[in-house]
Amino acid sequence: MKVGFDHKKYLEEQSKYILERVNNFDKLYLEFGGKLMGDLHAKRVLPGFDENAKIKVLQHMKEKVEVVICVYAGDIERNKIRGDFGITYDMEVLRLIDDLRGYELDVNSVVITRFEGQPATTVFINKLERRGIKVYKHYPTKGYPSDVETIVSDEGYGANEYIETTKPIVVVTAPGPNSGKLGTCLSQLYHENKRGNVVGYSKFETFPVWNVPVKHPLNIAYEAATVDLKDVNMIDSFHLETYGEMSVNYNRDLELFPVLKKIIEKITGKESIFQSPTDMGVNRVGFGIIDDEVIRKASIEEIIRRYFKTACEYKKGQVDKGAYDRMKMIMEELNLKPEDRNVVLPARNYSNKLKESADKNDTCPVVALELEDGTILTGKGSDLMNGTAAVVLNAIKHLANISDDMHLISPVILEPIINLKTKTLASRNVSLSCQEVLTALSICAVTNPTAQFAMEKLALLKGCQAHSTTILNRDDEQTFRKLGIDVTCDPEYPSQNLYYS
């Protein structure tokens, strides 16, 4: 993999800049946008970026940091899913707490935002409190967003519970967007100022990158990742007017800035130190870029991946037509085609070839996988195993120089697994999944050195690209994610079945 980003340089620059910002205050409330850990988007568009870079920045100064996690009550109520992990937001909060503790960071509390007594949220609050987690309840802010007098009063932010904090940097994070992080920070600013404390607010958001051109593929990839939120990159007009410098921000921050500035000035009783949304940020990711061409190429590849993701989400009814149309416009703007992704045509061509001799209704699912050296392998779905399992076996055989006709998994192992699945557990989906096949392979590896040698090649699949001619089920998606394979799918279901697919 060609590296375009210097992780070490970024870590030093980012830590230093946050500490400089906190020096102006007794306490800094730092709103963390995007993902605190496992930022796979940043890792893909910035080759060399550590997916856990942001939490490592905090770990550098852990003695000065405590974390508050926000979650919107409505997201818990409707079981909102974090797409990349396939878990609900309430479970993501628990995972986040465990991970933060793993990095030796203090988790202060969980804040339930816009709480209106929702039953499922109340159950979640009880669960947290009975595990010893402090929970605060914040309510819909009266007068928000335009009535500043009411917002900055005992009826507005004053109605929220004050979060007791002890460290100079309070990181406010969340499982996903629109969770109430900004509202929580401003509510705390209100309460802290009433107590006579000198506190500040800043925002740590990786994308868009403020010191990279607005039409750079890196920033366009951010638009592609947020088509459902209707985020649009724009020149920060406030920054340009004040400093005469070009800077990039997104529409929501620019639209909100005048009101936000008024709220901060009303809370503090003095003129804001921020003259633009860019001023509010502490993001230094742009200074870690060391090879612009590598970043451009990686970002373009990400945009095509996002096109397939949006197309599949539209097929599943998870996004509206507007989001899908915006995604197509982004592709057209950069003169990109889905087929520009190397693994797409090999998968489709093999599937079409299989269809020539198959039943009319057979979708002939195929998965293609590109290895680091550019070799593209394919795997087809069968009665024995699905396409994801087949292509992974073919890939590790190729990497281990094992003959294609040699069986890695003994029928003695496979038959009991298939019988368990079909007869004992009465599953209608007979084909073994990728994880089931890898489990069978690991059992064979105990007595078969060839299987063991092939298994050792699984680590080489990290960073590989794959494409499926049909939508993968969640289990196979997650297995590919754990293997580090970036997979896209054509927006077609593998069968006519609505549930058993």
Curated annotation (Swiss-Prot):
Pfam families, per database record: DUF1846, DUF1846_C
InterPro entries linked to this entry: DUF1846, DUF1846_C, DUF1846_N
Family from the record: Belongs to the UPF0371 family.
Alphabetized NCBIfam families for the sequence: PRK13663.1
Record's protein name: UPF0371 protein CD630_08980
